[in-house]
Amino acid sequence: MICSKVPVRAWFATLGLGCLGLVAVGMALQTLLHLAPCPLCIFQRLLYIMIGFVGLLGFVLPAGRLLWSTLAAGLGVLGFGVAAYQTWMQAFPDLAPECGFTDPNAIERLVDWLGMEWPSMFLATGFCTSRDWELLGLSMANWSVLIFAGIVAYAVLLFVRKDRA
């Protein structure tokens, strides 16, 4: 199998740089298209950053491959759940509790705090049910579901592959 000849460090570097690249693309779209991210969007952004750093840690410390791939998979599963919930909110906006109009949950409190500390990166000003941007008929939340599923599959492959630093 040709993939097994690629060093594990390269796989982790791809994961890390890919996730950080997704954050950069999201920031560019937000700025250029004047999009207003919601608390769930910002939390997904935070998860992409965390997975990116886990990938870079795997690049620097490839001996911890099992730990790094498990962390990436766990964060990916969490991201998948958040993105799927936002996708549901966008599909059924009449049934969805809108972010910001109820008592804040742990995610909203974290996002609010991050937004005060680094507003250009983490300030949530949008609504979770809005579909302001679409590509090929899929909203950004829909794309995040697919991307997080891919990250989980990628992390599982990193976990089960033969060790080759």
From Swiss-Prot:
GO terms for biological process: protein folding. One of its GO terms (molecular function) is protein-disulfide reductase activity. Its main location: membrane. Residues 1-11, 62-66, 162-165 are cytoplasmic. It is a multi-pass membrane protein. GO terms for cellular component: plasma membrane. The chain crosses the membrane at residues 12-28, 47-61, 67-84, 143-161. It is found in: Cell inner membrane. This is Disulfide bond formation protein B.
